[in-house]
Amino acid sequence: MEWIINQLRDHPELAIFLTLFAGFWLGRFKIGKFSLGTVTSVLLVGVLVGQLNISVDGPMKAVFFLLFLFAVGYKVGPQFFRGLKKDGLPQVGFAVLMCIVSLIAPWILAKIMGYHVGEAAGLLAGSQTISAVIGVASDTINQLSISDAQKATFINAIPVAYAVTYIFGTAGSAWILASLGPKMLGGLEKVKADCKELEAKMGTSEADEPGFYTALRPVVFRAYKIDNEWFGKGKTVSELENYLVENDKRLFVERVRQKGVIEEVTPDMLLQPGDEVVLSGRREYAIGEEDWIGPEVIDAQLLDFPAETLPVMVTHRTFAGEKVSTIRALKFMHGVSIRSIKRAGINVPVLAQTVIDSGDILELTGTKLEVETAAKQMGYIDRPTNQTDMIFVGLGILLGGLVGALAIHLGGIPISLSTSGGALIAGLVFGWLRSKHPTFGGIPEPSLWVLNNVGLNMFIAVVGIAAGPSFVTGFKEVGFSLFIVGALATAIPLLSGLLMGRYLFKFHPALTLGCTAGARTTTAALGAIQDALGSDTPALGYTVTYAVGNTLLIIWGVAIVLLM
């Protein structure tokens, strides 16, 4: 054991990977629905490893933190700038107000309790579950005109306060929004009914059973043998498809076999009893059609044709701001189904009245030719790739860091975004540029996950190890009262957001809950809300507010230091 400890001291990089391994492993465990989460687990393991007095020096901590912040900005950039347009301003205004409350509440509570700047920053980071504040606040503290010893004391106190307040910040947020939230908006059953009404209003063609997640329904291809009298002496392909649409069944004839020969499908092709047809569309539309068309047939030859699902980034201005129903009706969408819509990494319900934004990723499914034709009309085919444009990433962080390093002096105090704030802003701008010009700057989802999660947790691991020797002393100083203060700092902005959404902005209850979760950037709470309501509609209010909230709450790491 002593040999292992000595090796960790001699090779601190191994201590970091020990922290990552154990932290990610611990973060997988759940008690009921509660989990510490990866970030808190990595921090606590880092604190334990730090008891071995391991010195972790060098720029590695800053490097990984900058990668993380750039990834955060890159992910939400398109939606952040999209929200600044006229129709997104109410949600932007809501997010800004709620973020201001999210800063003021911890600040006032910290002043009342007599906390120093490090404890206040940790309170903000943990109660609002915005881990990046740890790094941004640390950078800002390092710019203060105080002794190095004071800087170290303040910076080492941040993870202590963060760890104490993060638990309720996560679990409490989900409980408040999923349990108290619906009650404050008229009661759970009323809000559920309001969600079903919104779903019906936004797209009556979608199935409306409780808990039916439209974005996750697969598209299927099924074959039937025609034997219904409705076809009489024959119906054309277009007549059959129009009849299906009139009955809220958006299905397409993809293949026809007549007299044993598979024929090319045309709109005026005559379908007669005995013919075999392949229909494509959402599963809920295709199931049951054999009751009137005819029996389903399982025929490998008939169903053996190229089908494709393509992710398409919407870049053409013609389609930005259009509803799903409008896009579905376009000629080039014949035979093509929208399988899912992703916005800032969040699945948005596929309803007839859902508005498509520039930068949205649409999954289109159908035959290879039809899907590729539709994809080229709508935007850029974002085919899966394993290559990250590191020229784009490196240049973005460099330029952002240089801008963030610029400082203005107020009363002799240098004030700047810091290199970390600059990297975040660069990520926003570069992510937006990528949505407008998708031929460059690509970062695949797995790579973005690595930049986001490994970047943050590498940083947190180093923070935990460095704070380890002073963590226990710091915890004794703040005491259990900090947990109560943290719970108040978590609850006040959330309750304020619910009241603002209902009475000031007069949002729909589903949007109020989604906007509140988004402004606080708590994805776990969004999932809890959707489970409680049995509806995906709260996600419609999440993406814009998440983009704004993620940006402002990180910048508040600078603000809380200056306010204290």
Curated annotation (Swiss-Prot):
- This protein's superkingdom? Bacteria
Transmembrane segment boundaries: 12-29, 34-56, 63-82, 92-109, 116-138, 158-180, 391-413, 449-471, 478-500, 541-563
Q: Listed GO cellular component terms?
A: plasma membrane
MF terms from GO for this chain are: monoatomic cation transmembrane transporter activity
Localization per Swiss-Prot or TrEMBL? Cell membrane
What Pfam families does the annotation carry? Asp-Al_Ex
Keyword tags: Cell membrane, Membrane, Transmembrane, Transmembrane helix, Transport
Q: How does it sit in the membrane?
A: Multi-pass membrane protein
Q: RCK C-terminal domain: which residues?
A: 295-380
Record-linked SUPFAM superfamilies: TrkA C-terminal domain-like
Q: Name one GO biological process term.
A: potassium ion transport
Family that this chain belongs to: Belongs to the AAE transporter (TC 2.A.81) family.
Task: Spell out the PANTHER family in the cross-references.
Answer: K(+)_H(+) ANTIPORTER SUBUNIT KHTT, PTHR30445:SF9
For this entry, the protein name equals Uncharacterized transporter BT_0736
The scientific name of the source species is Bacteroides thetaiotaomicron (strain ATCC 29148 / DSM 2079 / JCM 5827 / CCUG 10774 / NCTC 10582 / VPI-5482 / E50)
**What lineage is this protein's organism placed in?**
Bacteria, Pseudomonadati, Bacteroidota, Bacteroidia, Bacteroidales
